[in-house]
């Protein structure tokens, strides 16, 4: 079998790889547990309590990373030869503020993982699944890779 085949089927290389932030490279649920002073995020009674507490705050810029985040980002950079972007869902009703603080977090993590000049495009959408092919707006049939939790 050729290099670009698997099980006799031709493998199609993704056009672009999109990496989600919350729950993939940022410890969103650990941040929630800390914010609510509980041992596990499932101890928080309602989703509305979460939204009410973090709306209008810098919550997203204060999230921690996973022990594997930096190694994972380096792997993505190497595997895609730099052809990847961030896709993240902004907090409903607080889109502008949450995106601002997600950008701050990403700037800090990218600066730490790579260098201060390193940057990646960031897209904010509540329909991340649409980005699994093309740009989420047009369709050429070329698949993308969406890494999400």
For the regions a protein language model found, what residue spans apply to each?
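Short, Lys/Arg-enriched N-terminal segments with co-localized hydrophobic residues
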Residues: 1-10
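Active-site neighborhood of HAD-like aspartate-dependent phosphohydrolases
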Residues: 11-57
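A general structural motif
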Residues: 12-14, 81-83, 141-143
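Short, solvent-exposed loop/turn segments at secondary-structure junctions
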Residues: 23-26, 31-32, 90-94, 136-137
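Substrate-recognition element of Asp-dependent hydrolases with the DxDx(T/V) motif
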Residues: 64, 69-102, 106
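Acidic, glycine-rich loop-and-strand cores that form catalytic or ligand-binding grooves
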Residues: 101-114, 119
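Conserved Lys-Pro-Asp/Glu-containing loop-to-beta segment of HAD-superfamily phosphomonoesterases
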Residues: 118-149
């Amino acid at each position: 079998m050729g290099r670009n085949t698997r099980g006799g089927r031709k493998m199609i290389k993704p056009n672009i790889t999109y990496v989600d932030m919350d729950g993939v490279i940022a410890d969103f649920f650990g941040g929630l547990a800390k914010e609510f002073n509980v041992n596990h995020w499932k101890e928080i009674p309602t989703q509305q309590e979460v939204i009410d507490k973090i709306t209008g705050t810098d919550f997203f810029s204060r999230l921690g990373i996973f022990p594997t985040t930096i190694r994972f980002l380096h792997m993505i950079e190497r595997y895609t030869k730099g052809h990847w972007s961030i896709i993240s869902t902004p907090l409903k009703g607080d889109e502008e503020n949450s995106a601002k603080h997600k950008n701050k977090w990403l700037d800090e993590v990218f600066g730490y993982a790579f260098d201060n000049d390193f940057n990646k495009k960031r897209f904010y959408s509540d329909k991340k699944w649409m980005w699994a092919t093309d740009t989420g707006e047009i369709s050429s049939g070329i698949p993308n890779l969406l890494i999400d939790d």
